[in-house]
Amino acid sequence: MGRRPARCYRYCKNKPYPKSRFCRGVPDAKIRIFDLGRKKAKVDEFPLCGHMVSDEYEQLSSEALEAARICANKYMVKSCGKDGFHIRVRLHPFHVIRINKMLSCAGADRLQTGMRGAFGKPQGTVARVHIGQVIMSIRTKLQNKEHVIEALRRAKFKFPGRQKIHISKKWGFTKFNADEFEDMVAEKRLIPDGCGVKYTPNRGPLDKWRALHS
């Protein structure tokens, strides 16, 4: 018996049901890699960031997330080179879906009990996504804006429902606006730290502030 189509599990009807000591024997999620491309690129190398944003409250299967990841990665490698971008899948499939297997052979009515004891066995995992939640993000150089939009557009076809493509006003994967970012780094209010930044607040010991600005 094959996998049941994901359209059967598209809507968020039940409460979140994660893997636990009570919910055992869950098959591994299809998606294993959530970051692709040049993920160790410094924060100042990739200022542009594009998001794919969900427009529906639904469930996305781990198979769909994997298919979208492969699709976006393949296009970005072809158009920007394998070191010209960083893709991050922002959803993790933690919700376990169940199946109550039914026999379809002759004489099945003697072997099975129909809807008696119908709590199913774990079949796979899905990610629950809300309206306005980011599904996937890509950061790259400013000249690759059109390629980011096209990669996310192609990845959209792997998902049910509606999604929007949004070019962020923030710098890369940080939460700081792109037009203020370089000034804040120059003033040492932001310290680059891998693909993110550390924010140094105005509070704290004066000696620490003097040491930073000396």
Curated annotation (Swiss-Prot):
GO MF, one example: structural constituent of ribosome
Database matches in CDD domains:
Ribosomal_L16_L10e
Give the main localization category: cytoplasm
Which processes are annotated in GO (biological process)? embryonic brain development; regulation of translation; translation
Q: Where in the cell is it found?
A: Cytoplasm
Gene3D superfamilies for the chain: 3.30.60.300, Ribosomal protein L10e/L16 (3.90.1170.10)
Sites where Citrulline occurs are at: 32
Output the NCBIfam families linked to this UniProt entry.
Answer: PRK04199.1-4 (NF003239), uL16_euk_arch (TIGR00279)
What does this gene product do? Component of the large ribosomal subunit. Plays a role in the formation of actively translating ribosomes. May play a role in the embryonic brain development.
The protein here is known as Large ribosomal subunit protein uL16
- Please report the organism this UniProt entry assigns to the protein: Pongo abelii (Sumatran orangutan)
